[in-house]
Amino acid sequence: MVSSWRVQQAAREIRAGAVIAYPTEAVWGLGCDPWNEDAVYRLLALKSRPVDKGLILVADNIRQFDFLFEDFPEDWIDRMGSTWPGPNTWLVPHQDLLPEWVTGQHDTVALRVSDHPQVRELCALVGPLISTSCNPGGRPAAKSRLRVEQYFHGDLDMVLGGALGGRKNPSVIRNLATGEIVRPG
């Protein structure tokens, strides 16, 4: 895959510990490297979000999450795979394979394989990313680059331009083990 110059620049920034904003399927997102503790805590501070709530990981394809699936029943993997890429987020057991600054106080972690072209390009270059709505706590998620700038006044390392994917609502969130819908889409 040949990535655009701006996506390559965003990948370099993320590898260096940046927190960036980028368009997703429905709203603008904030993202960073999930393994970079400083970057994740900076993102949480920007949002005024407590670490115990946990965060979503977004990827280019299901294989980027293979390290989590070693002991999963095959039907779980098939269930997720049949809904990806797309607006479906699954809560899956993390088996202590992810840091607590990603999982919060939960035994599960939220995973999604995006169908947004820029998000997929970016994840193809850097692997799974933290992806959370671009807004300070209690405010509506940004639906425009202007709103991103108004919310964060230059506190982000980069804003990756582009268009939203056209969805009206964020992804549905389901518990993989129970099938329960935790958040409708």
UniProtKB/Swiss-Prot annotation:
It is found in: Cytoplasm. The keyword tRNA processing applies. The keyword Phosphoprotein does not apply. GO terms for molecular function: ATP binding; double-stranded RNA binding; L-threonylcarbamoyladenylate synthase; tRNA binding. SUPFAM superfamilies: YrdC/RibB. Gene3D superfamilies: DHBP synthase. Belongs to the SUA5 family. TsaC subfamily. PANTHER family: SUA5, THREONYLCARBAMOYL-AMP SYNTHASE. This is Threonylcarbamoyl-AMP synthase. The lineage of its organism: Bacteria, Pseudomonadati, Pseudomonadota, Gammaproteobacteria, Pseudomonadales. The gene is tsaC.
